[in-house]
Amino acid sequence: MRHVDGVVGNRYDDPDLDEQLHAHEDAGRLERVVLEAGQRKRSRLRVETDAGTDLGIVVDQPELRAGDVLFLDDDAAAVVEFESRTAFVVDLPSPGPETVAAAVELGHRVGNQHWDIAIEGGTVYVPVEADRRIIEDVLGEHIPDSGTTRYASVDASLFIGENAEPSGVDHSHEATDSGHGYGEDHDHDHSHDHNHDHDHNHDHDHSHSHDSHE
């Protein structure tokens, strides 16, 4: 097992580091650690890269971020990525009183359900953590007539970074901070302060109008 004591840096914050990773990728030496969103706040974890390298990681920051570099040397490098998530997407109409009111009401509804939410411009994203019919029933009546809805596969970090909004969930943990092994589920209890410049690619599953169901 390769031990990782802290993060080297983040490729989206450091152009020189990003350039080094591109060089490793071109040479076939870049390894990826794909995490579930729930793993990002663990202080210690044991994972395997897509190349099969076993890593024992001690995290030296509040949470892992997409683009964090776990190790970098002449022979190889490893970077953190997150699994994609399916989201219920609401495209709101042009800004106006109706749109603002709808966005506020959608935020309240999502918060009441303790779901995550992210907002980019006039688009609202809610990860599919419940039955799709339930999500549509809870949110549908608060979507303006000129708004549209769809489902899309999005980068999970969308719900972690600066676009994410509080969901009302208490993210505190009950575990004591002693004797944690790499595999134990110990989460940092910190606010999110994550900013990166990569795009969130949306692979649309289907489109539908929010008023198409009863």
UniProtKB/Swiss-Prot annotation:
Residues 168-214 have a biased composition (Basic and acidic residues). This is Urease accessory protein UreE. The keyword Heme does not apply. Pfam families: UreE_N. Belongs to the UreE family. It is found in: Cytoplasm. InterPro entries: UreE, UreE_N, UreE_N_sf. Gene3D superfamilies: Urease metallochaperone UreE, N-terminal domain (2.60.260.20). GO terms for molecular function: nickel cation binding; unfolded protein binding. Residues 163-214 are annotated as: Disordered. One of its GO terms (biological process) is protein folding. It comes from Natronomonas pharaonis (strain ATCC 35678 / DSM 2160 / CIP 103997 / JCM 8858 / NBRC 14720 / NCIMB 2260 / Gabara). Keywords: Chaperone, Cytoplasm, Nickel, Nickel insertion. One of its GO terms (cellular component) is cytoplasm. Involved in urease metallocenter assembly. Binds nickel. Probably functions as a nickel donor during metallocenter assembly.
